[in-house]
């Protein structure tokens, strides 16, 4: 499958690398590929993953069947605008980002909550896209290697389009997730995003980001 991962931070790089390892054709989108490739952290990673193609947001999205948004939440809509609404039309857009506000330091707050979600804002901004929210409730290591945990835990999926959620669920299964919980329509992403404040607190208390939430039935 042709996939575009928008975002070159730790999570974007982890997801892009793992999906390429699984046999997908992956582009990693950035505002300025030349400047990104000049960064020491990215250059070293890119040398280890030559099968992942750096591209502009627009070029990555244009070539993709599925677009994954793995950016700082405050930049998500802007990044997708640069990718181009015409390049998102009819495509599955998997939103992994979170509406975290670090303007007052740590711990962060949420810049959208309760009656809205970042995923819904993305859907409203790009109504022809098929937005699915998932993977936002865990660290990037656990996103791509859930087997690192003795019990991988649960992963949540929200979206209005059943076929788009099926596509996202297929990718989650490839990544090794087994407890995939469909929360319902895209408004259910509000709850998934609101887990982040407690996730951040847990990380501080436990001194590690290598954990996950688990729904016990």
Give residue ranges: language-model regions.
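Rossmann-fold NAD(P)-binding glycine/threonine-rich loop
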Residues: 97-141, 145-147
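Short, structured coil segments at secondary-structure junctions
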Residues: 50, 89, 126-127, 175-176
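Rossmann-like NAD(P)-binding element
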Residues: 48-92, 98-106
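Active-site-lining helix/loop region of Rossmann-like oxidoreductase modules
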Residues: 153-217
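NAD(P)+-binding Rossmann beta1-loop-alpha1 motif at the extreme N-terminus of oxidoreductases
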Residues: 1-44
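General beta-strand structural signal in soluble alpha/beta enzymes
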Residues: 54, 130-134, 180-183
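Glycine-rich beta-alpha junction loops
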Residues: 75, 97-100, 138-139, 161, ...
